[in-house]
């Protein structure tokens, strides 16, 4: 038997790939975030729970580490953390790639693609014809609980000629179907994104196959939305309870290509009303509509078919907005850690709030706990802790004018610094010394989000650290910053410090995270 390390080097050489540097021994693969077993991944697709199994589909190139040959990759999990890689679910074939889409259960077999004893699961996706670069909408179905998928023989279900009256490019920019059953109207609803036209279109169907255009949601019809927010993609749509009330509201979530707080792609969400044909947006607040202020939260979608007994709206996105530039050689693209999304009033404003799913607690072990301790300028806490996969929680009362800093993945010349600046109520992530930032002009820098103290003056920060990422949740989850980082293996330290005044640490809990 060939030595595994030698076999790996031979395999890499045969593929023409560069070996990871000695400073990074495992190609930056994360410890507890999902990555494809190899090659390219971008945004998640068709997120659905079937029985006790969570299904993750994702945009995947199964043959190379760059975008292209796009199909639906597939993985399953019973806890959203331990993932089993599965064969390709929806392949690219006959010159048609399988772009982004969504999945849904058809319990009454309205599609006719199953039967009453075994209703089908349906997946809608954009078919991208490489020769013409046109995009149409297609359907696949599963009658074995999502294990395998068959393309509908009558594809496309919305052709480019049908799209053309509602798409000024004639079908070059109609993609990413979000489909769900609208109980109130008794119809199936499809939401399509129209890229550079900065609009969504809404379609209805009685049978999931034959579709009729109903309306457009344009940027000009959303009061308060900046004209700089362009290139709409990857829509999601769902009802969300407003915590503390008996009300629900409709939410549209999407990913503009430009205009996000950190530059480039970002995910925003807007509330409004939906009558089964058209969505009327509430006026937006630029300070609360972005779900993430970091650079690396792109193409978010939510899991559907989650039992009411669970009740959570769980979302995830791809953490990569640099194309094929990141310095990984055997894989590209990783899934953000799944997070819950809810809507509640924080202070005087209504916010979307997000938190890592509670399942994370089952794979974490406490390394150090501090309580009711004052940290003063010149002190450094947590410096004895080492780790590259951590869940760090800090709750503190900052003095006026103080700055609390938590350095993670800290080494001799590398660190990623999470700061809270009391004077302007700002949470920030500083990647300027985070490791390798040479791969892309946008790879370094400082990303910020507003985070007010609560009514008692308390500030809460939670940081998920993994091999090549940080995800920072401030307050109740109203301020979130997600970023990729690429430090050396040896940069595994922590440091908690304060300048400009003291901070009273109500609690500090540092946990190691492991899937093993």
UniProtKB/Swiss-Prot annotation:
Its EC number is 3.2.1.7. Changing residue 295 to A: Decreases catalytic activity. One of its GO terms (biological process) is polysaccharide catabolic process. Keywords: Carbohydrate metabolism, Glycoprotein, Glycosidase, Hydrolase, Polysaccharide degradation, Secreted, Signal. GO terms for molecular function: inulinase activity; sucrose alpha-glucosidase activity. It catalyses: Endohydrolysis of (2->1)-beta-D-fructosidic linkages in inulin. The active site is at residue 43. SMART domains: Glyco_32. Pfam families: Glyco_hydro_32C, Glyco_hydro_32N. One of its GO terms (cellular component) is cytoplasm. Changing residue 99 to A: Strongly decreases catalytic activity. Changing residue 42 to G: Strongly decreases catalytic activity. CDD domains: GH32_Inu-like (cd18622). Endo-inulinase involved in utilization of the plant storage polymer inulin, consisting of fructooligosaccharides with a degree of polymerization (DP) value from 2 to 60. PANTHER family: EXOINULINASE INUD (AFU_ORTHOLOGUE AFUA_5G00480). Belongs to the glycosyl hydrolase 32 family. This is Extracellular endo-inulinase inu2. It comes from Aspergillus ficuum.
